[in-house]
Amino acid sequence: MITSVEKVLAITRSILDKVCPNTFNHNTAEARAAFKGHTEFIARNLVETDFTRKQIIPYVLAKCGDKYLCIQRTSKQTESRLHNKYGLGVGGHINDEDQSPDQDIIDAGMRRELNEEIQFPDEVSCKLVGIINDDTLEVDRVHTGFVYVLESSTETFDLQEKDQHLPSWKTIAELTELEPLMESWAKVVFHNVIKAAT
């Protein structure tokens, strides 16, 4: 029996570190240009332990008015390294099926992941605001985050995989109290996107 191997988009670590040397980087246009020719699809089971590359993860922060969507990951979530932590983004790996001649592959992967994980009743806008290159945890050393801000006019949404995520809308003051329990990327986004905008 032939089983398919999941392949995910990854960036060469040396290129990423050169263009995005900081934990959070605002130079998204420069980074996109520099990454051309330095990304490839690799079997996920191989790249999970390959520290010469980082898997590209679209990470979408949802905002409605003065509140942000906060998601606690349950122990049923597949990534055990993030169990019970609070996240501020939804997203996931970019697969080769996301390739399209009409759309940037990272944007296409972001839209697919967003549609798979969460649906808002109205059309929402998403803007790329930065790139995370953090090595705080083991999981961070093999992933880089493309951070998008989603602006919604309503707090109403439909979240898939409800057994894996506990969502709630939080103000900045409420997020400040939760910061010690946040996953590392959520802390980066909290300081460099949410608090930086106030």
Language-model regions: role of each:
Residues 2-36:
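Extreme N-terminus nucleophile/cap motif
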Residues 2-4, 11-12, 39-42, 84-97, ...:
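Nudix hydrolase/Nudix homology domain
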Residues 19, 68, 154-158:
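Residue-level signal for secondary-structure boundary sites
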Residues 48-52, 98-102, 106, 136-140:
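Conserved aromatic-histidine-acidic binding/catalytic patches
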Residues 121-130:
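A short coil-to-beta-strand element that immediately follows conserved catalytic motifs
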